[in-house]
Swiss-Prot record:
Family matches, as SUPFAM superfamilies: GatB/YqeY motif (SSF89095), Glutamine synthetase/guanido kinase (SSF55931)
Cited function: Allows the formation of correctly charged Asn-tRNA(Asn) or Gln-tRNA(Gln) through the transamidation of misacylated Asp-tRNA(Asn) or Glu-tRNA(Gln) in organisms which lack either or both of asparaginyl-tRNA or glutaminyl-tRNA synthetases. The reaction takes place in the presence of glutamine and ATP through an activated phospho-Asp-tRNA(Asn) or phospho-Glu-tRNA(Gln).
Natural source organism: Saccharophagus degradans (strain 2-40 / ATCC 43961 / DSM 17024)
Catalytic activity: L-glutamyl-tRNA(Gln) + L-glutamine + ATP + H2O = L-glutaminyl-tRNA(Gln) + L-glutamate + ADP + phosphate + H(+); L-aspartyl-tRNA(Asn) + L-glutamine + ATP + H2O = L-asparaginyl-tRNA(Asn) + L-glutamate + ADP + phosphate + 2 H(+)
EC class of the enzyme, as a word: ligase
Assigned EC number: 6.3.5.-
Entry keyword set: ATP-binding, Ligase, Nucleotide-binding, Protein biosynthesis
GO molecular function: asparaginyl-tRNA synthase (glutamine-hydrolyzing) activity; ATP binding; glutaminyl-tRNA synthase (glutamine-hydrolyzing) activity
Gene name of the record: gatB
Name of this chain's protein: Aspartyl/glutamyl-tRNA(Asn/Gln) amidotransferase subunit B
GO biological process, one term: glutaminyl-tRNAGln biosynthesis via transamidation
Subunit description: Heterotrimer of A, B and C subunits.
Family, as annotated: Belongs to the GatB/GatE family. GatB subfamily.
């Protein structure tokens, strides 16, 4: 049987306002629990919410960036439910008239083609508090600092067909949000969270029953979740069972998901207009003023990187997709005056290390100026590319800048011709049989045999021999 996967995403994006969506309480991350929740956030008697104009500005900027219709009349509703981290007993959100209407994001697929993922809408709402389990024995603590933090929830159409497309969309959305400056996108702090709606069906059939897995806070978790849930649903259906429409919770420690509750529909929440908030009217002039100040977006930045720095389509897309990565690259490239080497290091060694340690580039132990200093030492042949990786590792561990590490560890490249000639003579004398075989070999076979001598000399020099000079001297002596 040939199964098809159908995926829709709901993405919660915390907006980078200084205060909450309906109160003046701070949104700063990391404060002591329950020190940033005011009477309005807790819906204490006698309090009234006051909408945060900056949240509307950021939501509209997002809508413009994703080619969406902007709601000229925006209305808030109450979504009624009881949960410990929601002190009001309801969430103030939008249902009938959201701030952002239908739009789309184009994603690039692995084969180089482009696919359009439609956005159904994006609405403003307040975040809930946070349940804390790990710090308590047989109890759950509640931290309400996050309650009332402004969110936009971005809801896609079910246009996504596999995990690669889901992650491509999520990355592109993340890039747009950070490029606009409307959110920091820090998933480790919950600034962007994904709910994944998944169903499977036999090819050509109607949509199957979907499940929703909530609160995924990394691209890696999203991939694993989709893999597991698709496989689970297929196994259930092939065994003759039925899929239960339910909400599931993913555990990032065990990489497993479990049922959380049966999936609710809108009627279950008894939405009704919020009596404390008037409808908000958005004028064409205001929308245009925000359109005029939109910053450079990922697709435009990619095109500029290709033209300005001569980067490949792949490198430009990789480095231009994220505002923080783009800034890091440009600072590095200008400091060392070498865009290509900067691109190679930022997209290669640095990106791999950040990915392994799940760090954002703005939190890298090696900043852009320091990486530029390392690249400068490669360019002036103080060190080789191989040694540069050792230097980078030491810099990552906080042992100083490139010059400090090179000096302290004695890693300067050996470029003295006399010293290199002696190394070559010693290796040739110790391996006369290989020298004779090289000289007797056909020219097309000598290149492979040359690697043996290079390897021996590099071993003797602890990788510090200048490769270009070494090759010249070695070839000269072997061919003589």
């Amino acid at each position: 049987m040939e199964w098809e996967t159908v995926i829709g995403l709901e993405v919660h994006v915390q907006l980078a306002t200084k205060t909450k969506i309906f109160s003046g309480a701070s949104t700063a991350f990391g404060a002591e629990p329950n020190t940033q929740a005011c009477a309005i956030d807790l819906a204490m008697p006698g309090t009234l919410p006051s909408p945060n104009a900056k949240a509307f500005e950021y939501a509209i900027m997002f809508g413009l960036a994703v080619n969406a219709e902007i709601g000229k009349r925006s209305v808030f509703e109450r979504k009624n439910y009881f949960y410990p981290d929601s002190p009001k007993g309801y969430q103030t959100t939008q249902l009938e008239q959201p701030i952002v209407g239908a739009g789309y994001i184009d994603i690039e697929l692995d084969d180089g083609s482009t696919k359009r993922i439609r956005i159904h809408h994006a609405h403003l709402e307040e975040d809930a508090g946070k349940s804390l389990h790990e710090d308590f024995h047989d109890m759950t603590g509640i931290d309400l600092n996050r309650a009332g933090t402004p969110l936009i929830e971005v809801v896609t159409e079910p246009d996504i067909s596999n995990k690669a497309e889901a992650v491509a969309f999520a990355r592109k959305l993340h890039a747009i949000v950070t490029s606009l400056g409307i959110g920091d996108g820090d998933m480790s702090q919950g600034s962007m969270r994904f709910d994944v709606n998944i169903s499977v069906r036999l090819k050509g059939q109607e949509l199957g029953t979907r499940t929703e897995t909530k609160n995924l806070n990394s691209f890696r978790f999203m991939e694993r979740c989709i893999d597991q849930e698709v496989q689970r649903q297929i196994e259930v259906l092939e065994d003759g069972g039925k899929i239960t429409q339910e909400t599931r919770l993913y555990n990032g420690d065990t990489h497993t998901a479990r049922p959380m509750r049966s999936k609710e529909e809108a009627n279950d929440y008894r939405y009704f207009p919020c009596p404390d908030l008037l409808p908000v009217e958005i004028t064409d002039e205001y929308i245009q003023s925000l359109r005029d100040k939109l910053p450079e977006l990922p697709d435009a930045r990619k095109a500029r990187f290709i033209e300005q720095y001569g980067l490949s389509d792949y490198d430009a897309g990789l480095l231009g997709s994220d505002a923080n990565t783009a800034h890091y690259f440009e600072v590095c490239a200008k400091a060392c005056d070498d865009a290509k080497l900067s691109a190679n290091w930022v997209a290669g060694e640095l990106a791999a290390r950040l990915n392994n340690e799940e760090l954002a580039i703005q939190n890298s132990p090696v900043n852009a100026e320091q990486l530029a200093g390392l690249i400068a030492r490669i360019k002036d042949q103080t060190i080789s590319n191989k040694i540069a990786k050792q230097v980078f590792e030491a810099m990552w561990q906080g042992e100083g800048d490139a010059d400090t590490v090179i000096e302290a560890k004695g890693l300067k490249q050996v470029s003295d011709s006399g010293a290199l000639e002696k190394m070559v003579d010693d290796v040739m004398a110790a391996n006369q049989q290989q020298v004779d075989a090289y000289r007797a070999a056909e020219p097309d076979k000598r290149k492979k045999m040359l690697g043996f001598f290079v390897g021996q000399i590099m071993k003797a020099s602890k990788g510090q021999a200048n490769p270009q000079q070494l090759n010249q001297i070695l070839l000269s002596k072997l061919d003589s």
